[in-house]
């Protein structure tokens, strides 16, 4: 009898258990090569619907489809082996009913092999989160600024600037926590409120434009790598400046091709004699 051993990935439960132990590290990934580079350094990779804007040039995430998320989820799973992988439920794939959410989430887990799904929403989505979790689908919540609601909110701006917004964030975070999410992304939320809910929730909070007190942090990898120079959100730090590096590499390549210095003989195949 042979024993087959496979490397165990971090699970949603292991991410949840990190609350109070150490900060949780997360980044987005959409492709196999990037997932392979990030995998050794993060606790979980999020295949975010931000790919619609980052990879496809869409103005918002609303146009992202379930098929797109599954295709990129498969790519990230192929490129990673140790971290937990979470895939976003895109707009229109879960809001209609908890049954629709289950069908979409189950399809993502079955077709990608990922460990969990993420969905945006507060108290109004708590029943859906509980429905999924009770049926074996781990859920990463998402409160605060919710990009999928851009058409009703009128744009992307931080939330928690008045008492009404603060009350809503508190209510949303508690509802998603009580529903059983293993962690909750807190996006674009004023720092004191993000700090407060982090201290009161069972589930770890993952901040993006929130607070250093959050239990973990996430950034869009392309932002972190400095691939976009035209717009830099306040909460983004460039840990590299790859945009000019890539541009210079393309320029050098173009110049060598035009000068016929590339390819050289060393880059060609010869007949063996």
Curated annotation (Swiss-Prot):
Residues the entry annotates as binding 3-methyl-2-oxobutanoate: 49-50, 88, 118
Cellular component GO terms, alphabetical: cytoplasm
Record InterPro entries: Pantoate_hydroxy_MeTrfase, Pyrv/PenolPyrv_kinase-like_dom, Pyrv_kinase-like_dom_sf
Catalytic residues, chain numbering: 187
Cofactor dependency: Mg(2+)
Positions with a binding annotation for Mg(2+): 49, 88, 120
Magnesium in keyword set: yes
The protein's Enzyme Commission number: 2.1.2.11
Localization per Swiss-Prot or TrEMBL: Cytoplasm
Major subcellular location class: cytoplasm
GO terms, biological process: pantothenate biosynthetic process
Enzyme class: transferase
Catalyzed reactions: 3-methyl-2-oxobutanoate + (6R)-5,10-methylene-5,6,7,8-tetrahydrofolate + H2O = 2-dehydropantoate + (6S)-5,6,7,8-tetrahydrofolate
UniProt keyword annotations, A-Z: Cytoplasm, Magnesium, Metal-binding, Pantothenate biosynthesis, Transferase
Details of cofactor binding: Binds 1 Mg(2+) ion per subunit.
One Gene Ontology term of the molecular function aspect: 3-methyl-2-oxobutanoate hydroxymethyltransferase activity
Entry-linked Gene3D superfamilies: Phosphoenolpyruvate-binding domains
Pathway field: Cofactor biosynthesis; (R)-pantothenate biosynthesis; (R)-pantoate from 3-methyl-2-oxobutanoate: step 1/2
Quaternary data: Homodecamer; pentamer of dimers.
Function, as annotated: Catalyzes the reversible reaction in which hydroxymethyl group from 5,10-methylenetetrahydrofolate is transferred onto alpha-ketoisovalerate to form ketopantoate.
Family to which this protein belongs: Belongs to the PanB family.
Name this polypeptide is given: 3-methyl-2-oxobutanoate hydroxymethyltransferase
Protein source organism: Rhizobium meliloti (strain 1021)
Phylogenetic lineage: Bacteria, Pseudomonadati, Pseudomonadota, Alphaproteobacteria, Hyphomicrobiales
């Amino acid at each position: 009898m042979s024993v087959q051993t496979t490397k165990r990935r971090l699970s949603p439960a292991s991410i949840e258990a990190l609350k109070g132990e150490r900060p949780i590290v997360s980044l987005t990934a959409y492709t196999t090569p990037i997932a392979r580079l990030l995998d050794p350094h993060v606790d979980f990779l999020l295949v975010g619907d931000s790919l619609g804007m980052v990879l496809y040039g869409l103005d918002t995430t609303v146009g992202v489809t379930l098929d797109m998320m599954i295709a990129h989820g498969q790519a990230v799973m192929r490129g990673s082996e140790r971290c937990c992988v979470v895939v976003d439920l895109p707009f229109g794939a879960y809001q209609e009913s908890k049954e629709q959410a289950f069908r979409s989430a189950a399809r993502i887990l079955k077709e990608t092999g990922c460990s969990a799904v993420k969905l945006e929403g507060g108290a109004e989505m708590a029943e859906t989160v509980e429905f999924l979790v009770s049926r074996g689908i781990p859920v990463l919540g998402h409160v605060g600024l919710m990009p999928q609601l851009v058409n009703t909110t009128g744009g992307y701006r931080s939330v928690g600037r008045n008492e009404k917004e603060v009350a809503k964030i508190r209510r949303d975070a508690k509802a998603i926590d009580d529903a059983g999410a293993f962690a909750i992304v807190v996006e674009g939320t004023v720092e004191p409120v993000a700090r407060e809910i982090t201290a009161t929730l069972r589930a770890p909070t993952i901040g993006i434009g929130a607070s250093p007190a959050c239990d973990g942090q996430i950034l869009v990898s392309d932002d972190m790598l400095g691939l976009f120079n035209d717009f830099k959100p306040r909460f983004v730090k460039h840990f590299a400046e790859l945009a000019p590096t890539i541009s210079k590499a393309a320029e050098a390549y173009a110049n060598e091709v035009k000068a016929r210095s590339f390819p050289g003989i060393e880059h060609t195949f010869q007949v063996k004699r």
